[in-house]
Amino acid sequence: ICGHAGLITNDLKIKDEIKTGIWFTDFYINKKYRSFGYGKLLTQAWMKICPIQVTLCNDASLKIFKKLDWSSNNKFLRKLEIFNYLNLIPIFKNNNISNVIKENLKIKEINNQTVSNIANESEKLLSQKSFGVVRDENWFKWRVLECPYKKNMLIFNYEGIDIITNLKVKYNFKILNIIYTSRPINLNLTKVFSSFIRKNKINFISYISKNEKILNVSLPWSKKLNFAFNSSDSTIKDSINEDFND
């Protein structure tokens, strides 16, 4: 085995039409085979599956994609915020999750009804856009109910905003990863959400946001992401570059 690749199919709404694209999720070539051009061959095989391809990738993968006429931008950032400096010290750690949260922030049960309600709201919001990722009921069932890490998920609602999160433990630190919000998180929500994180002694909160920095520089707590994409249709390619923001 010299390498492997993974992908997920996902419908996209582009100029009010539903198109199927593939999201490249995993791309690896064994170091001793990287000079043989296998990365390029693997990507070319990938590209035959579907005419629209998108991914978030590292610099090494981006070099391969660009050789095949892909486009890219850095409009997204992976952000990591520290919320419990004291809890970084092992003696102060607490692994219990408390349901004591501010009145307007609610934890919802993870079941079919919750997922169905979130999906309905997502489809309503998408109907108001000319471009976006199609997240219907099947998408949310796959992403939440069928997820192998379902037991680590928490779904919040704050004044009508749904927030799907995954609680991970890495190097003995608790990280709350935000994987979906129905609408942008405003400052007030950030404050309320932070209160829950502090009460439960979660060390970090991780999320992807728009890159609004003037200088395109990565920092330990704010890493620029390579968003790469390709399509045989140049108008679709332009639309992804201009309108893809969720």
Language-model-detected regions and their locations in the chain:
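A broadly used, surface-exposed interaction patch
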Residues: H4-D26
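Amide-forming acyltransferase catalytic core, primarily the GNAT-like/NAT-type
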Residues: I1, G6, S71-I179
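Beta-sheet entry/capping signal
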Residues: H4, G21, P51-V54, F204
